[in-house]
Amino acid sequence: MCLLGVSAPTVASYDASAPMSTASNGDVDIAYRVVGDPQAEPILIIMGLSASHRVWNPQLITGLAEGGYRVVLLDNRDVGESSKIEKKGRLWLAWQLLKYRIGLRVKSPYALSDMAVDAVAVLDALEIERAHVIGASMGGMIGQIVAYDFPQRTQSLVSIMSTTWAPHLPQPGRAQQDGISEMNESSEEQAADLQKLGFYPSALPNQVTAILSAGDRTARVAQISAPTLVLHGADDQLLSVEHGEHTAQTIKDAQFKVYENMGHNLPDPIIPQMVNDMLAHLRANPI
C-alpha cells in the first residue's frame, strides 16, 4: 500500500478476532491489541460511546499500520474484553438524563478522566513513553484529556467528530437522543446482536453520564500543547460540525478539516483520504 507517495512494507492485516493483551489501572483491566511494526512510532487509538475497538474501520487501522506506525487499540472500560464496572439500569440513566436537561448535577460511576488514565495504563504496559493519540467521538474527548493531563505522553493528537462540550454548542438532535435511549432499552437478544457488531448497550448508563458529568472542558482543552488535527463530518447530526470547529479554535494552531458526506460515523468512501490526512499530520510531528 502506498500513501502520500511513500511506500511502506506490508504488515499483517488487522484481525479483530485475535487474542488481546491486558493492562491494569488499579482494579480495572483494559484489553488491547497492537497492529503493525513493533519498532515503529506508536499510535494510541480510542473508540467512542459503548463501542469496542472492533468498531474501527479495518481499512483505517491497516492504512495507519502500513503507513509505518504501530497502532495500539484498546477496549474502554465497560466494553469488549475490558473490565465491566458497576452496572446501572435503564431507569437510572433516564433519571440522570432528566437531571441534565433541567440543569441538575449528573452522577456517574466513573469519569472520563478515569478512562484517560486507563489509556495511559496501556502505554505503561507496553513501555511506551510517548505516543500519537487518535480518538473518535467520546474517544476524542478521552484523547483530549490524555493530551492535557499527560502532555509528556502525547506526541500529537487527532480528534475525530468530538467536542469540548461547551454549553453554547448545539445539543444532539431529538432523533439522536432517542437513538441512544432506544439502545439503552435493548432487549437481551438485541444487545447480543449489537455486541456482535462491537457495541455494548450495557455501557451506556456509565459512559453517557461520564460525558455529561464532565461538562464544559473548554478551559482544559485550551491547555493542549500537542500538535492537533481536528476532523469532523459535515453531516454529523449527533455532534454538529460546530463542535469540531470549536475544538479546533480552542487548541492553539490546531488544523481543522471537514469531510462532506460524513455524519457521526466513519464511512468507507472517506477512509482513504482520512488516512492520508492523519499520516500527513503524524509525519509532520515525529517522535
Task: Give a label for each model feature.
Residues 28-98:
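Conserved HGGG/HGGXW glycine-rich cap/lid loop of the alpha/beta-hydrolase fold
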Residues 101, 109, 113-131:
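Conserved acidic catalytic loop of the alpha/beta-hydrolase fold
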Residues 131, 135-137, 233:
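Conserved alpha/beta-hydrolase "nucleophile elbow" surrounding the catalytic nucleophile
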Residues 141-148, 157-184:
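Flexible "cap/lid" loop of the alpha/beta hydrolase fold
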Residues 204-220:
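Active-site nucleophile elbow and catalytic-triad environment of alpha/beta-hydrolase enzymes
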Residues 224, 230-232:
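Short beta-strand/loop motif that positions the catalytic acidic residue
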Residues 237-243:
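Conserved alpha/beta-hydrolase "acid-adjacent" motif
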Residues 254-287:
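Catalytic active-site module of serine/aspartate enzymes centered on a nucleophile-bearing elbow/loop
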